[in-house]
Amino acid sequence: MSNFTYTSAFNLSDNSPFNPAIGSSSSSSSALVVASDDDNNTDDACSICLEPFTLQDPSTVTSCKHEYHLQCIIEWSQRSKECPICWQLFVLRDPASQELLAAVEKERLLKTRNISSSSPISIHHSHDDFHSEEEESQFSSFDEQFLRHLTEAAHRRCLLRRRDGQISSSLVSSSDPTTIHPTDLVNLYRLSAISHVEHQNSNPCPSPGSMTPSPVSGHSSIPADSNNGSRISPGPSPSRSSQSPKSPEASSLPEAIKSKLAAASAKYKESISKSKQGLKEKLLARNNSVKELSKGVQREMNAGIAGVARMIERMDFSSKRFGGSAHVSTSTATASGFNFSFKGKRVEANSKSNNNGDKTEPQKLQGGETC
């Protein structure tokens, strides 16, 4: 058989990977390549969502040379306008992306304005990303409301001053201040309503020139009626001359009400004082009756005590009269072994033995005498 040589097949050339020197170098180089690939992958990932960039979702470069997804930048701009790495303002190099970011911010501002205008209570946001435009709009609306309240308060103050001047200028009182008719109250309400409407139609603060009285013609435009009070004829413009005849009647009505209230209060005070006096008299009468009853009871008690004393005295006299017979009865009773003595209403029985030969002691009566 022929000899086959395998030297060519098993010859390890310098470029063969099975060479130990070359194998070690190739493994180290592959490790470096993998590490560099990992670094590139981390560098090519978005810092907000930590996901790599793809062809469908490419990276968007900012002015600070940081790359993010466009959607991540839009979502981040809802919270802050600064870069999350270097804290600089978001400025995109791509003009189309920058326009899209600006449009999103404008839309967000419009939504916040609509929400703040629709809700009656202002919403306090917890974030610090308030824009100057939003703050200016809020301050302007607050200023408008404040000025509106001020103008309304000034208008009301002018109305009150004008009404007080009309009431204080008149010093005419009604003919009978103690009586108030329902028609007077109706006229008062009518006057107040008409004056309020006229003041609303006129300027809130009248000028001094408009307050000057105009000449009045011979025919009076306000006829007086005994039953209905005063009637007001409608005029084209409210003036001081047309309102001056109203003021005496308008002022006389409050004065009449005050006088009526004063008279009623005086009557109430008198009735209260009279009722107090009646109560005091009743209490005194009851006390006198009780005293008389107590005196009668004392008299009866004294009479009873006197009767009892007389009865006791009679008993004493009767015991004195029958003193001898009582002694005889006691001597006879000793023979049988018992001794009876009478002392008022009390009877004492004492037994004594005859064998000892004791002598009977004389018993004392209530009056202090011995029998």
From Swiss-Prot:
Biased composition (Low complexity): 226-252
Pathway participation: Protein modification; protein ubiquitination
Record EC number: 2.3.2.27
Catalysed transformations (reactions): S-ubiquitinyl-[E2 ubiquitin-conjugating enzyme]-L-cysteine + [acceptor protein]-L-lysine = [E2 ubiquitin-conjugating enzyme]-L-cysteine + N(6)-ubiquitinyl-[acceptor protein]-L-lysine
Example of a GO biological process term: regulation of cell cycle
UniProt note on tissues of expression: Expressed in stems, flowers, green siliques, cauline leaves, seeds and roots.
Source organism, top-level taxon: Eukaryota
InterPro entries from the UniProt entry: Znf_RING (IPR001841), Znf_RING/FYVE/PHD (IPR013083)
Disordered: region residues: 199-254, 348-371
Keyword field contains Cell division: no
Compositional bias (Polar residues): 200-225
Zinc finger (RING-type): 46-87
MF (Gene Ontology): ubiquitin-protein transferase activity; zinc ion binding
Cited Gene3D superfamilies: Zinc/RING finger domain, C3HC4 (zinc finger)
Record key words, sorted: Metal-binding, Transferase, Ubl conjugation pathway, Zinc, Zinc-finger
Subunit structure: Interacts with KRP6.
Record PANTHER family: E3 UBIQUITIN-PROTEIN LIGASE RHF1A, ZINC FINGER, RING/FYVE/PHD-TYPE
Function as written in the Swiss-Prot or TrEMBL entry: E3 ubiquitin-protein ligase involved in the positive regulation of the gametogenesis progression. Mediates the proteasomal degradation of KRP6, a cyclin-dependent kinase inhibitor which accumulates during meiosis and blocks the progression of subsequent mitoses during gametophyte development. Functions in association with RHF2A. Possesses E3 ubiquitin-protein ligase activity when associated with the E2 enzyme UBC8 in vitro.
Protein name: E3 ubiquitin-protein ligase RHF1A
Organism: Arabidopsis thaliana (Mouse-ear cress)
Lineage: Eukaryota, Viridiplantae, Streptophyta, Embryophyta, Tracheophyta
Recorded name of the encoding gene: RHF1A
